[in-house]
């Protein structure tokens, strides 16, 4: 994963997937790029490394940059973060009940571990991501389910 920051940021800008969270997934899945799958297959994210045969079934990429692009474009943007897609269970890391974790990983604490890694990286990097984003909350009381109330801050 060394010297791959630009690849993460470029793919964030191209496909809308947060670079810090992608880095967290890569760090967890590949032990910071040191796992045998990362080294032998250029696969930072454990893509298709199923529990029963991770080394055999994991995808092989021509380079780490190609792997990062495929993860951002195909796996995240077009599948796990695409509403209506079979793997979509919410646009957040989550756990085994909701979010990316439902279909991505067997570890029920996968999302929590990535969030902790991302928080630590952001904290050590000057907290550039902390409080940067607004969260949209869909008003599910509306019968048409078409309104989206965006709040600047929490209220009671």
Show the residue positions of the predicted features.
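Catalytic cores of secreted/periplasmic lytic hydrolases that degrade extracellular macromolecules
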Residues: 1-22, 31-149, 156
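The canonical Cys-X-X-Cys-His
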Residues: 25
């Amino acid at each position: 994963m060394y010297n791959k920051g630009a690849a993460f940021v470029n793919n964030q800008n191209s496909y809308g997937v947060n670079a810090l969270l992608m880095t967290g997934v890569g760090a967890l899945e590949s032990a910071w790029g040191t796992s045998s799958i990362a080294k032998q297959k250029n696969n930072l994210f454990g893509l298709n490394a199923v529990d029963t045969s991770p080394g055999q079934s994991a995808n092989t990429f021509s380079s780490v940059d190609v792997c990062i692009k495929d993860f951002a474009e195909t796996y995240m943007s077009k599948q796990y973060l695409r509403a209506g897609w079979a793997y979509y269970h919410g646009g957040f890391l989550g756990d085994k009940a909701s979010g990316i974790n439902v279909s991505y990983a067997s570890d029920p604490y996968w999302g929590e571990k990535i969030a902790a890694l991302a928080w630590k990286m952001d904290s050590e990097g000057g907290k550039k991501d902390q409080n940067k984003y607004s969260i949209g909350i869909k008003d599910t009381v509306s019968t048409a389910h078409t309104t989206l109330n965006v709040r600047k801050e929490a209220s009671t």
